[in-house]
Amino acid sequence: MRLKGNTKGKTMNVFISGGAKNGKSSFAQDLAVKMAKESGRPLYYVATMIPHDDEDRERILRHQENRNGMGFRTIEAGKNLSLALHDTEGVYLIDSVTALLSNEMFREDGSIYYSAPRKITAELRELCQNFDSLVFVSDFMYSDAIDYSESVEKYRKGLAEIDRMLAQECDAAVEMYFGFPTIYSKDEEVPEILRKMAEINEQTAGEEVQ
């Protein structure tokens, strides 16, 4: 776990992955809020989704309602996160890596930027090295056997490479499955804040997750 010279408290970078409706967003929000409260740092929500249809807009609205009253300052950044994050003492919830890659890879003019995974990997690795209170959220989408188009397969492979890098660079990684978190930590012991949250989640598992 890293500790900056002028930090207001212990911090960590965390990578959270899970399938749809597995509770990763709620877990990430609660974690970021607790990290900010315990460290006395400002709290930011980095919204990476660029809406393209009503379903996207409804999803964004639902997430906004869920965050209401939690103390987040919202930063909208569908691309170029390194230009949007300035406060190195802040706690940032970046939701999501999945949308970030999609924005960069599938262009508005219909073209496909196949180097997007490499660009995003380098950008997020640099953020991990320069910031010490980041919570990344990503969607797990590698378990089905559907035959996708070449571009979608390259997207899935690229996302997997980014996720792998984040799991290696972050202090801890969390895999969400039906509301149950499995925690992997670089330290010998799981950070207390994550351990306590896991215990709470186990007690409330079975309730509606998102």
Question: Over which residues does each language-model region extend?
Answer:
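Short, glycine/serine-rich, charged loops/turns that create anion-binding
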Residues: A20-K21, I50, T98, M141-A145
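Charged, low-complexity C-terminal accessory regions
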Residues: L3, K8-K24, A32, E38-V46, ...
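Helix-adjacent hinge/juxtasegments
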Residues: M70-K119
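Residue-level signal for inorganic ion chemistry
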Residues: A28, H63, L93, D139, ...
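Conserved P-loop
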Residues: N13-H86
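Structured helix-beta-strand junction loops
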Residues: G69-M70, T88, N130, E169
